[in-house]
Amino acid sequence: MSIDWSQAITSERRAAEQALADYEVWKVERQARVDALVVEVDGLVFDGNEISTRRMADVIAAADDLADATEWTLADNRVVVVTVRQLKQALRLSTASRTAIWNDGRPA
């Protein structure tokens, strides 16, 4: 019986594999935090996840005026009329929160 030393697991390799595993766990946890993100504007609680913020950006881009209004489904699933100004503020808060989450606790 011979030993295949090419299959030996070094402490460096083990550390690299653990670092990769830690990073993958962190990414899943980070995405869960982003998916659950909510922000409040004028007493209205908006979903702040990536899909919702893309929708906000679409409405803002298509608006003629910040006073324009549209129906919006809030985080609690109530449909209300909101202004583009409110959506813009919700987008700004969501983006800032997501940016803070994005690198918080990143494994080395």
Q: Would you name each region that the model predicts?
A:
Residues 1-108:
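A preference for well-ordered globular domain cores
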